Amino acid sequence: MTPGQWLFQAQQLHPETLALQGPQALTHAQLFDESLRLAQLLKRQGIRQQQLMAVQLDSSWQLALLLYAALQLGVRFLPLDPGMDNARRQKLLSLVGCDYLITEQSAVEPGLQVITLSQLIDQSVSANVNFHAEPLEAENIQLLIATSGTTGDPKGVMLTAANLMASAAASEDRLGLAAGDSWLACLPLFHIGGLSILLRCLAVGARVLLQEGFDAKGVWEQIAKGAVTHISLVPAMLDRLLRQAGDQPPHAALRVVLIGGGPLSGLLAERAHAAGWPLCVSYGMSETASQFATDASPDAGLLPGLVGLPLQGYEVAIAADGRIRVRGEAVMAGYANPEGESGKGLEQGWFETGDLGHLDAQGRLTVTGRADDLLVSGGKNIHPVEVEGRLMRCPGISSVGVTGREDPVWGMVLVALYTGALTPEALKGWVTENLPTHLRPRDYIQIDQLPLNQMGKLSRGALKNRLLQADKGDG
């Protein structure tokens, strides 16, 4: 059953249970009707099956409704970061062959039609009983996701309906999602980590509790009253949530705290476990339709980089150079390209993640970091994630990022930029006592805030620029 058919199935099996809760609360029957109504409006604007519709909106609620409408109409869907600048947007939309763009305000985009949100909202149209849904077939491209890199040319990841079906089934198998559960969604919906929540819940008839951005107080209130069974967070969000909760245990209804989007420090994992938070540490990306490995064991997160066994339908291998490769039913059809060819970015079905890692005797995957981030100092390969994890165990350190500075003797020396009350001198003294020589940074720079992207993940390019500025005396 394809994602477009999930809407019909959910309203048949669970018509009166809540499907989507945000500014409004919609049952599965109401969501089916509303998505069908929006699909009619989109069709009146000229949008047809298998055309590509990009959506760039501030409102997660409106974006979610348009996704469901796209499923009904059989339209390919591309959610865009509302902060994406015009030049980058034009380049991406040209690359992927976009037909329509839905935005808050009118815009000029060569070669495609722009529809403002008001044009859809202003049309008060009831669902036409003669209008029939036109869901895509399993092999059709259903979703495109813009890669989240902040540098370089944007790419569009092509995911078929079959990819999304396999991903939802694999997640359900590992995490135990079922009808009646409630997944709090506070990640951006233009990222696969956020958007996949909508699809997983739709597949089984669960509820999505949708928040506009991450508000630790609001999230904790929902968890504390037992309204949440599942939640997806990045490590920075988990830290803020634990602080908001005062390191109290969550309500017993919460069964899964899915962590992804970057490495989870052992110290943060220990805090969460001590307070009784049910962590599941995951690893995945847009190209794999979200998570493809997840550690759901009772001690998840306590071993650095361990992300557990691959999910059903995925095969993981380690290349000779240590890079992680993955293939399977949910791995993308390829990167969008003007020729419309599938398989771009894949090698005989394998996708190379660009991350380094290893598999243990049990088949569990450990991720050590990005291959491109590897630093070579004095002939030794050092990954900054390992150093950062150790530095975070120092009392008085709130956050830390490690980067490299070119050196005529060592090739590269490590530099730590950190936040916290500890002085650089005191931190250096702690490091001397606790870290082996090759993992010790040469310098320590205290800053007000680490550069993070919208997912709360350390931006290593921006961190490098901060170091260059500091070396020039610019702060």
Residue locations for each model-derived region?
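Conserved pre-ATP/AMP-binding loop-to-beta segment of ANL
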Residues: 1, 14, 128-146, 153, ...
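Conserved AMP-binding/adenylate-forming core of the ANL superfamily
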Residues: 16-46, 54-60, 68, 85-90, ...
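Conserved AMP-binding A3 loop
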Residues: 27-29, 142-169
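Conserved AMP-binding/adenylation subdomain of ANL enzymes
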Residues: 165-182, 190-230, 244
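Gly/Ser/Thr-rich phosphate-binding loop
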Residues: 228-233, 242-301, 315
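Conserved ATP/PPi-binding loop(s) of AMP-dependent carboxylate-activating enzymes
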Residues: 306-313, 319-348, 380-382
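AMP-binding/adenylate-forming catalytic core of the ANL superfamily
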Residues: 328, 334, 356-439
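AMP-binding/adenylate-forming catalytic domain of the ANL superfamily
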Residues: 436-458
